[in-house]
């Protein structure tokens, strides 16, 4: 029994231990699976980081490569620009040397000195110049670069500094006419020497400068310098005759030429000596002279300019030309001058502008032109002959003569006073026919108005139309007597009758006739002839005369309204129309009076 119980206990303990181990194993398996999942996540993240790193490295390398390429292009453009500028400067210097007649130096191959870092000239440390009073020492330029030295040996110019180059440069004097009158002692130092003999005696040496001795004095150096400069300028003048192009001469040069041509031979020789001492062809001012065209003419060409230039440039001097062309103009065209007071231009310019000549100005030119003759005067149209009728607007005045529309003369002063002549003379038959027969019943007011009109007719108006005062025409207005009730009624009826008149009749009555109103004697005779007329007959007779009186009174005011300051041009056609209207009015007035 005891053995079986022990076996059961052992079996139970094994089962218990087995369960414990199984539980631990399951926990470990779960833990391992979680770790494996974490490891896989980490691997994916690491792979992503590696890819990002690779992309960043590629971007960085590409950016650096682009930066290097851009920097390379920038440096390349800078180098090309610098080289191009150097080449342009070299070309400018070569053109200046050619224009001055100098030989080309070390600039046969301009790329060599630029690329080798040397322009063919030694550094400044090699130049040593000492001034010991009148003694001058010269030291040749040392060449350290063999290429530059070879180029220097091949070229025909030496770069040694002599006493002419060491001496400080004089200030350049302008070739002006004002300074020719100044006394300069340097101009008169070597007049007794003949420059042609000096030029023939001295040999022309370009490679080697004249050796300077220690015992030479200052005046000898100056004379030697003058000889050297004269030799160079003579050679340059021979070359410049073919090389230098002709430059347009400005008025400053021509003015100096005019004054020099008028001087004596002694003054011309002094000018040549002064120009010979002028340092206008030093290398410091050659570039400036190249850019300024009027300063580039040499002193050898100055005498040519003096001979060919005129005495003065004729800019506003047109009198000689007009004198030369007077005969031709008189043969072709007959000109008639008009006084300035009676003739003005349409533009209404100020009268001061008339003082200027009507001829065109001539532009200044030199004798380098092919045509030395003066050109003819230009006009914008054909010359005008004022004796012929003008082609402009015309007006007709009563004298039937043509008048230009541009005259200043007042047209009212030229009018023919026809009415004054008729009024001062014997009245015509037409005026007698125009007098109307007025019935006997006219009141005394008509007689008063007739007397006033007669007085006005005896005084002819001496003033023109635009100066007539309106107060003269207002005189016939006189206060009438008080009217009775019957007269007021009759006046109302007559006013309505005036409105009923047709347009043609009222229009005829607007024009005033001088002899329509009865005179004082006619009125007295009419009143005295019928003293015993009844009121009915008077009323019946007054009716037509009242109408005529009212229209004639209104016509006096229409004269004032009809006055206009503007003058109507009177032509033959207008006069014919006026005559026809007068005839019609006479016939109409005769019919009314009948």
Swiss-Prot record:
GO-annotated cellular components: condensed chromosome, centromeric region; nucleus
GO biological process: cell division; meiotic chromosome segregation
Record field: compositional bias (Basic residues): 343-355
Region annotation (Disordered) ranges: 104-178, 201-266, 342-380, 519-549
Family: Belongs to the shugoshin family.
Functional summary from the UniProt entry: Plays a central role in chromosome cohesion during cell division by preventing premature dissociation of cohesin complex from centromeres after prophase, when most of cohesin complex dissociates from chromosomes arms.
Name used for this protein in its record: Shugoshin
Organism: Kluyveromyces lactis (strain ATCC 8585 / CBS 2359 / DSM 70799 / NBRC 1267 / NRRL Y-1140 / WM37)
Lineage: Eukaryota, Fungi, Dikarya, Ascomycota, Saccharomycotina
């Amino acid at each position: 029994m005891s053995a079986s119980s022990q076996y059961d206990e052992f079996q139970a303990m094994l089962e218990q231990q087995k369960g414990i181990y199984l539980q631990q194993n399951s926990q470990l398996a779960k833990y391992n699976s979680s770790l494996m999942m974490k490891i896989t996540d980490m691997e994916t993240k690491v792979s992503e980081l590696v890819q990002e790193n690779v992309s960043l490295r590629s971007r960085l390398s590409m950016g650096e490569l682009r930066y290097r390429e851009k920097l390379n292009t920038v440096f390349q453009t800078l180098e090309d620009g610098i080289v191009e500028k150097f080449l342009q400067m070299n070309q400018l210097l070569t053109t200046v040397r050619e224009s001055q007649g100098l030989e080309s130096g070390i600039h046969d191959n301009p790329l060599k000195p630029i690329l080798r870092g040397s322009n063919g000239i030694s550094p400044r440390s090699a130049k040593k110049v000492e001034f010991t009073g009148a003694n001058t020492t010269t030291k040749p330029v040392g060449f350290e670069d063999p290429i530059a030295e070879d180029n220097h040996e091949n070229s025909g110019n030496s770069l040694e500094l002599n006493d002419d180059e060491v001496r400080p440069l004089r200030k350049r004097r302008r070739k002006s006419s004002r300074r020719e009158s100044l006394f300069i002692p340097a101009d008169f130092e070597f007049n007794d020497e003949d420059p042609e003999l000096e030029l023939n005696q001295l040999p022309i040496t370009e490679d080697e400068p004249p050796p300077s001795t220690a015992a030479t004095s200052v005046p000898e150096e100056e004379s030697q310098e003058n000889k050297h400069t004269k030799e160079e300028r003579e050679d340059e003048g021979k070359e410049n005759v073919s090389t230098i192009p002709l430059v347009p001469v400005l008025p400053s040069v021509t003015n100096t030429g005019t004054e020099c041509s008028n001087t004596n031979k002694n003054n011309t020789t002094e000018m040549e000596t002064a120009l010979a001492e002028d340092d206008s062809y030093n290398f410091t001012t050659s570039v400036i002279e190249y850019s300024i065209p009027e300063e580039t003419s040499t002193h050898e060409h100055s005498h040519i300019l003096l001979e060919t230039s005129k005495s003065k440039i004729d800019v506003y001097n047109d009198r000689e030309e007009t004198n030369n062309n007077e005969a031709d103009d008189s043969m072709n065209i007959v000109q008639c001058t008009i006084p300035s007071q009676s003739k003005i231009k349409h533009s209404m310019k100020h009268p001061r502008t008339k003082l200027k000549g009507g001829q065109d100005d001539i532009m200044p030119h030199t004798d380098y032109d092919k045509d030395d003759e003066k050109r003819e005067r230009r006009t914008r149209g054909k010359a005008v002959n004022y004796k012929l009728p003008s082609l402009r607007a015309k007006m007709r005045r009563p004298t039937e003569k043509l008048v230009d529309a541009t005259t200043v003369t007042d047209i009212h002063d030229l009018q023919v006073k026809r009415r004054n002549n008729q009024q001062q003379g014997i009245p015509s038959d037409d005026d007698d026919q125009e007098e109307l027969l007025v019935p006997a019943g006219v009141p005394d007011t008509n007689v008063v108005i007739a007397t006033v009109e007669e007085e006005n007719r005896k005084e002819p108006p001496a003033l023109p139309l635009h100066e007539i005062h309106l107060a003269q025409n207002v005189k016939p207005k006189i206060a009438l007597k008080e009217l009775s009730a019957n007269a007021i009624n009759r006046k109302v009826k007559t006013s309505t009758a005036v409105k009923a008149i047709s347009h043609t009749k009222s229009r005829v009555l607007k024009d005033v006739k001088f002899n329509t109103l009865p005179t004082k004697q006619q009125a007295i005779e009419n009143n005295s002839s019928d003293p015993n007329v009844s009121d009915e007959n008077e009323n019946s007779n007054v009716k037509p005369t009242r109408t005529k009186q009212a229209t004639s009174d209104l016509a006096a005011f229409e004269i004032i309204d009809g006055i206009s300051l503007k003058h109507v041009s009177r032509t033959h056609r207008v006069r014919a129309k006026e005559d026809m209207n007068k005839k019609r009015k006479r016939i109409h007035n005769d019919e009314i009076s009948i």
